[in-house]
């Protein structure tokens, strides 16, 4: 993991960052409908497939890798790792696991299945210990679909990393649709960036050839 510190004085987002981080602290969320028909038709497992696709786009663009590290420094990680929740039916609680990114889905899926098998029965909130600092959070609420979803973080105005929440899939017009809520910090991510993310995610799902 490499964390490249940002020189704010020469940063082209300096005035935007200062405005939305300090003057008018602002986070926002957007909920979109993602066509996942291709995922189902390819026989891919939905949750790890979406983790893989989301991570691919997150790691493509610096605005989703910009963060304040544990030393309070502003910078950009060279790679982000998905941290995701799993549900425990017996206690109706959840745990967070994390799986390192791989360039191909088959390798990522193998590591995901290894992690869920090894740590899936650990009922602690941190199911897989020693999470690195360069993680981003993903969760799924498969019991209900939604048109809007918002996280209210009391101390979240210094948290720059995006958060993703998925809901229950629905079928509409011969397509399988997944609701996806994306929460970002306006200091590092504008409407253009989040829309580009959504468009590239949808394109990646459609065009990717996956060998299972």
Curated annotation (Swiss-Prot):
InterPro entries according to UniProt: CAT-like_dom_sf, Chloramphenicol_AcTrfase_AS, Cmp_AcTrfase
Keyword Nucleus found: no
UniProt entry tagged with the keyword Acyltransferase: yes
This protein's UniProt keywords: Acyltransferase, Antibiotic resistance, Transferase
Alphabetized GO MF terms: chloramphenicol O-acetyltransferase activity
PROSITE patterns per record: CAT (PS00100)
Coiled coil residues, start to end: none
Enzyme Commission code: 2.3.1.28
Protein name, as recorded: Chloramphenicol acetyltransferase
